[in-house]
């Protein structure tokens, strides 16, 4: 993102926890990956066998070192806490996501976590599975964390945010970012 630091906000002293496929220790994250927890392969060192997690972390907190400051994330000074909940194909299990939520609640103070980015969607069909995941997100919000969640790629029809078919107002506690496709163009939803 160009000119993200024009506002003066850099994310310094803000811990951003990213749930995704992991993180590659790229030069743009030097000294700012505070923690890495692997709920899939249980490895110790940061890695990303898919690249989606690294991409998301770059959008959030890349500091532009590799591009000599030309391309940065939206919070180039933030600390990154990365929880790998998706495998190399981008798939994951509800149980791993819920375990990651518990980890965040147990460690938020230690790592200074203030924002949680959940870059996962769901193809769950059972309403109970959705209720459990939404309850977990609500717990994070109730603990004082800002939760930013992907709207998902599985929306059943235009203007729906996720695979449950819930409208944005059904999720009062999380911020959603989404786009939808119409006539081969990607557009931001009008409800944002």
Show where each model-derived region lies.
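Subtilisin-like serine protease catalytic core
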Residues: 4-17, 21-35, 43-95, 111-114, ...
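Generic recognition of flexible, low-complexity loop/linker segments
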Residues: 3-6, 69-70, 136-137, 159-161
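Protease-associated
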Residues: 186-192
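Short, solvent-exposed loop/turn and secondary-structure capping segments
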Residues: 26-31, 160, 183-185
């Amino acid at each position: 993102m160009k000119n993200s630091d024009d506002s003066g906000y850099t994310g310094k002293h803000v811990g951003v926890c990213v749930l995704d496929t992991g993180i590659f220790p790229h030069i743009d994250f030097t000294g700012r990956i505070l923690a890495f927890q692997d709920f899939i392969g249980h490895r110790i060192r940061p890695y990303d066998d898919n690249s989606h997690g690294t991409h998301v972390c770059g959008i959030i907190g890349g500091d532009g070192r590799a591009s000599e400051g030309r391309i940065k994330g939206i919070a180039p000074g933030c600390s990154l806490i990365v929880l790998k909940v998706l495998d190399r194909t981008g798939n994951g299990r509800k149980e791993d996501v819920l375990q990651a939520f518990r980890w965040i609640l147990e460690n938020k103070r230690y790592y200074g976590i203030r924002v949680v980015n959940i870059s996962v969607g769901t193809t769950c069909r059972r309403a109970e599975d959705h209720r459990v995941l939404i309850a977990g997100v609500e717990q994070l919000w109730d603990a004082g964390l800002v939760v930013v969640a992907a709207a998902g790629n599985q929306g059943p029809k235009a203007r729906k945010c996720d695979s449950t078919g819930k409208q944005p107002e059904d999720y009062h506690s999380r911020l959603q970012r989404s786009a939808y496709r119409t006539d081969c163009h990607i557009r931001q939803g009008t409800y944002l």
